[in-house]
Amino acid sequence: MAMNQEIMNLFNPTTPAQVFDQIRISIASPEKILSWSYGEIKKPETINYRTFKPERDGLFCARIFGPIKDYECLCGKYKRMKYKGIICEKCSVEVTLSRVRRERMGHIELAAPVAHIWFLKSLPSRIGQLLDMTLKDLERILYFEYYVVLEPGLTDLKERQLLSEEEYLRAQDQYGQDSFTAMIGAEAIRELLKGLELEKIDAQLRAEMAETDSDIKHKKLAKRLKIVEAFRYSGNKPEWMILTVVPVIPPDLRPLVPLDGGRFATSDLNDLYRRVINRNNRLKRLMELRAPDIIIRNEKRMLQEAVDALFDNGRRGRVITGANKRPLKSLADMLKGKQGRFRQNLLGKRVDYSGRSVIVVGPELKLHQCGLPKKMALELFKPFIYSRLDAKGLSTTVKQAKKLVEKERPEVWDILDEVIREHPVLLNRAPTLHRLGIQAFEPVLIEGKAIQLHPLVCSAFNADFDGDQMAVHVPLSLEAQLEARVLMMSTNNILHPANGQPIIVPSQDIVLGLYYLSIMREGLPGEGKVFADLAELEHALYSKVIHLHTKIKYRWHWVNEEGENTVRLLETTAGRILLGQVLPKSPKLPFDVINKLMTKREISGVIDQVYRHCGQKETVIFCDRIMALGFFNAFKAGISFGKDDMVVPGSKWKIVDSTRTLAKDFEQQYNDGLITHGEKYNKVVDAWSKATEEIAKEMMKEISAVRKAPDGSEQQVNSIYMMAHSGARGSPAQMRQLAGMRGLMAKPSGEIIETPIISNFKEGLSVLEYFNSTHGARKGLADTALKTANSGYLTRRLVDVAQDCIITQADCGTSLGIKMRAIVDAGTVVASLGSRILGRTAGEDVRDPATNEIIVKRGDLMEERDVEAIHQAGVQEVKIRSALTCELVNGICGKCYGRDLARGTPVNHGEAVGVIAAQSIGEPGTQLTMRTFHIGGAAQINEQSVIESNFDGKIVIKNRAIARNGEGHNVAMVRNMVIAIVDPDGTERATHRIQYGARVHVDEGDMVKRGQRIAEWDPYTRPILTEVEGEIGFEDLIEDQSISETLDESTGIAKRIVIDWRSTRGGADLRPAIVIKGKDGKVLKLARGGDARYMLSVDAILSVDVGAQVKPGDILARISTESAKTRDITGGLPRVAELFEARRPKDAAIIAEIAGTIRFGRDYKNKRRLSIEPLDKNEEAREYLIPKGKHIHLQDGDVVEKGDFIVEGNPAPHDILAIKGIEELAAYLVNEIQEVYRLQGVLINDKHIEVIVRQMLQKIEITDQGDTDMISGEQVDKIEFNALNAKAVEEGKKPATGNPVLLGITKASLQTRSFFSAASFQETTRVLTEAAVNGKVDPLEGLKENVIVGRLIPAGTGASMAKIREVAVKRDRLILDEREKQAAIVPAAAPEAEPLSLPPAE
């Protein structure tokens, strides 16, 4: 490699080899710009229109930028290598490579200084912040409207005072010409910036910050202080933000290209530079001519505008357009956006050696192969073929080889075969949503023009054969081939990186074939026969003595775990024996694994087990065999379906009629005024969705029923049922629409239409039904188009925030971790503890609760067997290591991450876990968004309003508060009542949080059976209950001010609703409430001390009247909740984005920050004042102002725990972090995000979400700066924070304190330590401006920055290279230190001796 470099450098002396570890960005000083430049550009001309040679001193000048042809000067006096380095005396052009025209820069000397628009206009304006002036004032000075006073002298003027033209002249008259200095334009700003004494300002700002009490002022000062410090420490000078010299980029980067027809296409930059040069020259001339001030000023203003447009066109004033009214692309536009330098050329490069074609299925391929059309292969492997032809002596020149290949001679095909053997190619299908979208295969040459793809990898590529295209890429270098073979081969990608499940899973026909193969039917010919071996069985099959599905007995030879040969007599079917033949022989895989009906899920499970017990190679062979078997049997079975396979259940109309009656009842209740319109709507919709479910159940019963033939044998299973049940195609939901009832439809707005579609597709829809059903379908299609883009953007943000998350060490040694429990939702286990801890590292010893012996040691990875043991022992909670608590500075350690899901082994050093996490979360986003329309908007509602026990056990109630109301029901009176079901040995099996106002059917100590009802409630309303017995009284419930009797138009019945009393006349001070009075007419007291007064919120519907007698638990009023909306990932994607962006939800919940007692204070304008008196006397009371329309379901005197909700709603993640800490926040985010994906049946491992959340928690907000340089209130990187604090402690100073802050993914990406990464993500201008002002150094640690500067990424194989380089640098350092020591010792010992000769430095 080094040799090559040297040879290259012989021919290319201009570029020194660049070795660097970091890149720094800062503001260029005028001296720096001149040092880059090879000459000044004085003329706006580009090239001579006759000779087409560049004009001298023009924008393409050869004297400045270098020759146009290699080693040839412009006039042609010197040609060839031998004159290298000579400067021609005639045309002054250096004889060298023309490539220097890509590197050499020029400059323009400006006649008047101009402000750099980025530092002026990019908000916040850096110049403005430094000078403490507003942007408006700055612009007035810069664009020559106002003078600014620099030196007031002895006059009454103040420094930095703005004076208009008249004021300036008046002041000169008043105080005399030279009594004060005022200037105008960029010169004035430059003088101001030059005169800044940063140290003084720094001290002054710190003093002011210490004195101020106002938060806003403090923030403002902190911002200014930050920028002052940036200039102090970065070595940038403030006056450099004003330009006196403009650099000109090399001409080959802004080329002039001749088009046919004698015209030229030019880069927009040339136009922009030309304007600057023209205006600059004109200004020079006017100044020489001593033109009037007003003209010069105008010219200076125009020069400022020209330079602005060059740097950032359109940032200020109107956009400068070219000849065709198109805005010109300025330097800033070259960088930003998808088409900018960063994203188009540095992060996304195009490659040579690639082709694309349509894909077709290749069922006879092995898993590691793909079919490559010969024509395509010939083109792709051309260079290899040429070199082989040459090596074999079949051609002597490339030209000859070319001819041979073009003629497609037979020897060429032989050589192509040789070349292709063992040379993997990469296949890619766009969109590449996760890493399985690019995989390596060994090419097999085929005729035809389409690429053949193995059927089992389709699900990884998300490919189908309806016209999809795929691209082929050839890895050229040996390293690339090696990586393709070892890391990317399709045989290595058996498990899905998102969840560790197999992704090489049979689908469609294969599943159907295997399902058919494994069916067992009663009463078929030959039932009960016994077979000794396969030959007998096949003989019987082929001679039709038995059927594939006949129940038979078979002698199965098997090796058990001790390694002994055993024989079992199995009851099975012929089909299953055939399936058993392809199962790998392993003691861990008994025949029972496949001695059952094979659905897609079962097959996936078998593949998983084969992978775990027999390893990768066996799995691949097994998959190939199982595929062949499935295809063959699907073909033999000849399954098809007809109209009669869709069975409409007989009981359908009975169910429909009864539901219609029910709906009529609700209609009547509404007309009688017993229920509101919203409640009626909810109930009707509920009834219909129940009916639909019931019909679907009936239909499934009939379709799946086993029918007997006259001879007593079981008939074939229904084909449609087979397809759906096996998981080959279709789902019960689709079958329901075909043969049951289509059910409820959603409007485009997401609301559900009350009238359902009663027909199914077999019966056909009526016109009205058809119209209603088009809504859903159309919405589905429109959504798809929109959501694909959203999902792609989410993935991009995720990748950006997590890209530098890499496994950098084996173990960080932390003792921290997070606790994992099973997730139980409404009594059903949604995610078991086992599934959540599998493949994670134990954070502490896991002990058996009964015997207290250790099941898993601390620091061990939990494998399948450990998880099983934990489950058997009935452990409820396990502490595991997590990415969130990993203490490494850079990256994550292997122990905290756990198992590499795609390999099933502990994670390797250098694995890019951040990118994998981002892909795993982003990929299903797109998948799901593309999938909404499959069910045609059929509305699915999940409202849960009963709790049934899932276990037998004993009831234990925590925070019990139950009252018996007037109707004799037991009612839950508190919000934090929890009913648990425990085993006889005391283990909790399930816990249920009981809704306030729910009817409870059990009590403490009761024994319940599985399926018994524990509690129920009305899901559509929230009640307000009374806790004491007495008589109703109203307070501030005044007709037409705070309460209105509304007549329901359709029913004519009045009901009383609390209206917004603040908006009525004279209602501002009202506090509407219901009170309970005793016999003496006084308001009763509650047990905990407050009055029995129940505040009402807007829209509450009263259920009682004045003077009525109530018992505890009776309903005083009820608040109607939102009508049921359908939940579909539409709600999902924005929800996921909202969580990752850490946005505050619209109606955020208000959370109690401390434990204490609730007290209501005086109301404030239109807010209720509520405070919490702490239980712990050391804490301060907290006060909250709550908008009056919000329903506070707490009463005066209630006790709340820290973290309880005062006002219901979605909690803001920032509040959870501040009040409950990182672990709770992580649990909340993980659960919320998982819930969205779970609804869609998508499995994502928790650790991926944890990795992203870790990246969102990288910043710390300083609460107390201690004796450090940090500023309180600013956000600092964790790494920086710890480093600065360590330094402070070392020096004996007081360290700073801070709290972790949660940043959304966009914000976190923009605040990463690498400015390259941030600039290439979004808001390029802002990021670069800020980085330059701060003189930021990019340590090149993440993946993105390394790709940008063209290095190996520090992950995967690049990680080991980085490690080697690190070791080498350390060694070199040691050697050099040793040399320096020796050099120091020798002269001291022998002053007259000659210096010691050392080996040359490396």
UniProtKB/Swiss-Prot annotation:
GO BP: DNA-templated transcription
InterPro entries: DNA-dir_RpoC_beta_prime, DNA-dir_RpoC_beta_prime_bact, RNA_pol_asu, RNA_pol_N, RNA_pol_Rpb1_1, RNA_pol_Rpb1_3, RNA_pol_Rpb1_3_sf, RNA_pol_Rpb1_4
GO CC terms: DNA-directed RNA polymerase complex
Keyword line: DNA-directed RNA polymerase, Magnesium, Metal-binding, Nucleotidyltransferase, Transcription, Transferase, Zinc
Cofactor (UniProt): Mg(2+); Zn(2+)
EC identifiers of the protein: 2.7.7.6
Database matches in Pfam families: RNA_pol_Rpb1_1, RNA_pol_Rpb1_2, RNA_pol_Rpb1_3, RNA_pol_Rpb1_4, RNA_pol_Rpb1_5
Keyword Repeat: no
SMART domains named in the record: RPOLA_N
Cysteines joined through disulfide linkages: none
Cofactor comment text: Binds 1 Mg(2+) ion per subunit. Binds 2 Zn(2+) ions per subunit.
Annotated positions binding Zn(2+) 1: C73, C75, C88, C91
GO molecular function annotation: DNA binding; DNA-directed RNA polymerase activity; magnesium ion binding; zinc ion binding
Catalytic activity: RNA(n) + a ribonucleoside 5'-triphosphate = RNA(n+1) + diphosphate
Positions of Zn(2+) 2 binding: C812, C886, C893, C896
Described purpose of this protein according to its UniProt entry: DNA-dependent RNA polymerase catalyzes the transcription of DNA into RNA using the four ribonucleoside triphosphates as substrates.
Stated family: Belongs to the RNA polymerase beta' chain family.
Quaternary state and interactors: The RNAP catalytic core consists of 2 alpha, 1 beta, 1 beta' and 1 omega subunit. When a sigma factor is associated with the core the holoenzyme is formed, which can initiate transcription.
Name listed for the protein in its UniProt record: DNA-directed RNA polymerase subunit beta'
Gene for this chain: rpoC
